[in-house]
Amino acid sequence: MREISCNAIISSIKEMCIQATHYLSDDMKSALYKGVEKEESPLGRQILEQLCENLTIAGKDMIPICQDTGMAVVFVEIGQEVHIVDGGLEDAINEGVRQGYIEGYLRKSVVSDPIERVNTQDNTPAIIHYSIVPGDRFRITLAPKGFGSENMSRVVMLKPADGIEGVKKVILETVDLAGPNACPPMVIGVGVGGDFEKCAIMAKHALTRAAGEHSSVPYVRALEEEMLDKVNRLGIGPGGLGGTVTAFAVNIETYPTHIAGLPVAVNICCHVNRHVTKEL
């Protein structure tokens, strides 16, 4: 049995909140710089260059990349042989988020009730997804999610007869409907299968995959490549002002489903696709 202290979790989450909101991961920076080279529209290139400059300023002056520093989404992989000590795991995660957003001077964007809309003043609670794995591994992925792109996301319950063409249609329709409102260029997470909530969680988790890293399943990889090409042919472009770089990646996850269903979720993220992973 391996023991992990809540204090270590709090400290890690706090640091991850500040890191994720001030610095893009290397894969996203690379995708952005490559986008400048690929973009055919002069205006589109200008917008991408401004986004690159914004990254530089954020890192140099230690200010957030975007004013929407997101709602904290946390994926936890915890081994069966791990014992959390000195407190509760969920309390520790939320305390880490609280400290990170307060000490990092990050925008507090969470309200305590969806109808009454009273701000919690510390960006808690986080949205936490747990996965129990063998052994004594403890891995945390933090993904602060902004809601400009979140509001453009969808879950569609297709019929099995809709097949792969139906899945393609949902992806393209979702991106097309989002247009400039998702702050393109974007990363598109897709979940196919499971049930209503499982496909949505997969779509969210797909956003944490490195840009340019494809599925290990051959047909899924082919679908990712095809959909990225089709999305970029929509011509939405950077900032929604036209161009050839609408998305950097389409990441798809799948799961077994019921014989009567074909659930599809599309979770869109803007170019500020923040994700940090740490093992304790």
Residues of each region from the PLM?
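Non-transmembrane, aqueous-exposed alpha-helical and coiled segments at domain scale
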Residues: M1-V190, D195-L280
